[in-house]
Every structure is written in C-alpha cells, then in structure tokens.
C-alpha cells in the first residue's frame, strides 16, 4: 500500500501517466502563429474565433471530438480541417491547447 502511494505521488509530481488539461493561454500563441490563417476569415468553413453560433454545433460534439478533428483532420458538411492546421510539426498537446483557446472565446 505504501509503495503504491509513493508511486502515485511520483507519477502526479512528474506528470507521468496523468492526462494534462489543455492550456488556453499557451493555445493563444499557437492560434496567433497557425490557426488565425483560417479561423479569422472562416476559410474552408472554419468557424471564426469568437463566433458562438458557428461553434455551437461543434461544441455539442464535445471537446474530445474537436481535439481529434484538429489533430487528425476532418472533412464534413460544414467544411474541412487539415491535420494540425497543416502544421504536422505541432505536438498533439499544442493543438489541444489551441482548441482550448478557441473554445474559451465562445463559452
């Protein structure tokens, strides 16, 4: 029991095996570098930053789905999203941070 508690404390301390929450503040920087190119102008059906109506149906699908579509890419009725906004060098976490930032502008 004592070893388990120590191991769990170590994992929590170093973030090993623990899902990290997306960071909207970090995501703002990614947005300004990458995402703005489509999401400021609504290119290819991209919902514009801060447009609650455009994001409503997407938000209803859940943040996990939005993260998946942003990371893997998506084509649907409302438009298309290239994987990682065309920047495949971005980490999945950076993309999730950018999604969190965009969602923070419409909640």
Residue ranges and their predicted role:
Residues 5, 14-23:
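Sec/Tat signal peptide C-region and signal peptidase I cleavage site
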Residues 40-68:
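Gly/Gly-Pro-rich "capping" loops immediately C-terminal to redox-active cysteine motifs
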Residues 35-41, 98, 102:
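The canonical Cys-X-X-Cys-His
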Residues 25-33, 44:
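Local sequence-structure signature of Cys/Sec-based thiol-disulfide redox active-site neighborhoods
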Residues 47-48, 68-95, 102-105:
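Axial heme c-ligation environment in periplasmic c-type cytochrome domains
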Residues 1-7:
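Bacterial N-terminal signal peptides that target proteins for export
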Residues 30, 58, 62, 87-90, ...:
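Extracytoplasmic/periplasmic, Sec-exported soluble proteins
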């Amino acid at each position: 029991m004592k070893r388990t508690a120590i191991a769990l404390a170590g994992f929590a301390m170093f973030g090993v095996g623990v899902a990290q929450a997306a960071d909207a503040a970090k995501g703002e920087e990614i947005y300004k570098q990458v995402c703005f190119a489509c999401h400021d102008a609504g290119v290819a059906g991209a919902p514009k930053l801060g447009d609650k109506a455009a994001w409503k149906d997407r938000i209803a699908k859940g943040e996990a789905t939005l993260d998946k579509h942003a990371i893997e890419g998506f084509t649907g009725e409302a438009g298309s999203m290239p994987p990682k906004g065309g920047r495949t060098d971005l980490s999945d976490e950076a993309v999730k941070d950018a999604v969190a930032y965009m969602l923070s502008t419409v909640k």
